[in-house]
Amino acid sequence: MVQAYVFIQAAMGKPSAVAEALRRLPEVKSAVVVTGPYDVIALIEAPDLQALGRVITERIQTIEGVERTLTSLVTGI
């Protein structure tokens, strides 16, 4: 299993809707609205890096209101 944090910049007025849409995806373990340069931070999990990439490009980046993402892989606890 591979985990990553996805930092999301959302369109004006869309952070809550983006976080709600993310929480409906089975790969998303948590999604919260935050302050700072990013609007939403999501923790996602996938079986491998290839699947993780697909989740980001095909499912997260296509959510209405998502403008930009930055992904950081979890390397340890």
What function would you assign to each model-found segment?
Residues M1-I77:
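A compositional/biophysical signature of low hydrophobicity enriched in polar/charged and small residues
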